[in-house]
A protein has these predicted regions:
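Bacterial N-terminal signal peptides that target proteins for export
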Residues: 1-8
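Conserved N-terminal structural module of periplasmic/extracytoplasmic solute-binding proteins
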Residues: 9, 20-128, 344, 359-366, ...
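Hinge/lid segment of periplasmic solute-binding proteins
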Residues: 36-58, 122-176, 206, 316
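Short helix-initiation/N-cap motifs at beta->coil->alpha
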Residues: 97-106, 201-207, 277-288
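Extracytoplasmic/periplasmic solute-binding protein
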Residues: 120, 161-173, 177-179, 187, ...
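Short, solvent-exposed loop/beta-turn-alpha elements that line the ligand-binding surface or hinge
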Residues: 140-152, 197-200, 220, 242-262, ...
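Glycine-centered hinge/linker elements that transmit conformational signals in sensory
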Residues: 212, 247-280
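Extracytoplasmic/periplasmic substrate-recognition and gating elements
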Residues: 306-381
Length: 471
């Protein structure tokens, strides 16, 4: 392999790949508009040593089917992962552009038609449904999971293991649903800062509910207040640390009778009954003082800071279930799938390894931080988005903390009867209704968990039986 030199300044020009779409979505697609500056990035001997002992894939091209191009366009930089893949491994990626509407049809057509396609973004439908459709190969023969670079990710990787094989090997986790709030508003209302509660291990459902009730009760005559808005249902249910569908490595089973899940659903009932939840869709933290907590992945934070210049915004992980030892969070795993019949298993595995290195090596993480803290401005110089260093640094601790556990539920990957996001109760998937039906209250949705569970439990049992027959 070529051994090239790099300069520190150029390393800091690299952009780190964004890992996933917002929680509740279906994929770990890359961020839009990947581009390269005029300066190429070269790598020193230490960097080129990352492929020691790996198969020689120099000259190979991976055909990647996706919505966004992994290669640079316009005038931005290559990602760290792509730079390593091209400069160390000597391989290339050719993107086959698709759309969100045709992505899965395009994948099936290319597989069935024998057209080249090697790599595909992990989608929540990938396992078990995509595997059972014959769309993917497992990665066991290509990735050495005993390599220390996978330390800290092993537990999550094991959760995705299906039929004894590793079809999904997440290289990073992102987009945890977090609670954004105004520290100024918290102080004005005489409430305890959620960050202080989190640091003391006291940020749980009880503290969350109590502060919202106080905030709403403090409303003046004629003032409308809500405790929370945003993406809450799934975050509440998954904060129990339990999934709707369990898998023991051989059989699936329904967990809809779980007492912990019932408590989460009863909490949603209470939020609705007390009118604490505002179902209005907000793209940023509301700046009118009407909402205390905004639940959303942090993609909004830069713009929310601009929209709330005097708010002193901060954020904390979603509160834990009372008595829980950890924070179980709704987030997205970034992973790439090896497509069925591909002869580029070694190359796809190498790219996955590059993504993992990009997410974990300190110099690349520092490069990502420097880019993240750059203000976004219009041509006229108006700031449209920014993060504070305090916000950024605290968010990074979530991905290394032993007290935070990312959640995964096979239920999202069991076909359209189980997962189908629509705005109609009768056509939504079971998972969608179970996660936030009691909050969203689309027409026809029962008002209680007991009724909702009873209406859909039979479908869960049927789907579980269907997939167990394939084991």
């Amino acid at each position: 392999m070529n051994k090239l030199r790099r300069t520190c300044a150029l390393l800091l020009a690299l952009s780190l790949t964004a890992a996933a779409t917002a929680c509740g979505g279906s994929s770990s697609s890359e961020s839009e508009g990947r581009t390269k500056s005029q300066d190429d990035v070269s790598l020193d001997t230490a960097d080129t040593a990352i492929n020691a002992g790996d198969p020689d894939i120099s000259g190979q091209t991976i055909y990647y089917l996706g919505i966004y191009d992994l290669n640079p366009t316009a005038n931005q930089d290559r990602t760290v992962a792509l730079t390593l893949f091209e400069d160390v491994y000597g391989a290339k990626i050719q993107t086959i552009k698709s759309t969100s509407e045709t992505l899965f049809t395009d994948l099936a057509n290319r597989i069935n038609g024998g057209e080249p396609v090697d790599m595909f973004d992990y989608q929540w439908d990938s396992v078990p449904n995509g595997v059972e459709k014959g769309q993917y190969e497992y990665l066991d023969d290509y990735i050495d999971l005993s390599d220390p670079i996978w330390d800290g990710m092993s537990e999550l990787i094991e959760k995705y293991k299906y039929k004894g094989h590793y079809y999904v090997v997440p290289y990073s986790v992102s987009d945890y649903i977090a609670i954004t709030y105004s520290r100024n508003l918290i102080e004005e209302e005489g409430l305890t800062d959620p960050y202080e509660l989190y640091q003391e291990g006291k940020w749980d459902w009880d503290a969350f509910m109590s502060s919202m009730k106080t905030f709403v009760a403090n409303a003046e005559d004629g003032e409308t207040r809500y405790g929370c808005a945003g993406w809450f249902g799934q975050a509440i249910v998954q904060s129990t640390g339990e999934s709707i569908i369990n898998y023991d490595g051989q059989k699936f089973s329904s967990n809809v009778m779980s007492g912990s899940i019932e408590k989460a659903e009863l909490m949603q009932e209470e939020l609705t009954r007390l009118n604490l939840f505002d179902s209005t869709w907000y793209g940023t933290y509301p700046n009118d003082g009407s909402v205390l907590y905004y639940g959303m992945a942090p993609w909004h934070l830069g713009q929310s800071n601009v929209m709330n210049p005097d708010g002193d915004l901060f954020l904390v992980p979603f509160p834990k279930m009372p008595g829980a030892d950890k924070y179980y969070l709704c987030g997205n795993a970034a992973a790439k799938m090896l497509v069925k019949n591909s002869d580029k298993g070694d190359a796809v595995a190498a790219y996955i390894k590059c993504e993992r290195l990009a997410a974990t090596k300190e110099e690349y993480k520092q490069a990502a931080k420097e880019k993240a803290l750059i203000e976004t401005k219009t041509a006229a110089g108006k700031v449209t988005s920014y993060l504070t260093e305090e916000q950024y640094d605290f968010m990074q601790t979530w991905y290394t903390s032993e007290d935070i556990v990312p959640m995964f539920d096979f239920g999202y990957g069991m076909g359209a009867r189980m997962a189908n996001e629509t705005y109609a109760y009768e056509t939504r998937g079971v998972m969608n209704n179970f996660m936030d039906g009691l909050l969203q209250q689309f027409e026809g949705t029962p008002a209680t968990w007991a009724e909702l569970r009873s209406a859909w439990q039979g479908v869960v049992d049927e789907v579980v039986e269907e997939f167990n027959a394939k084991q």
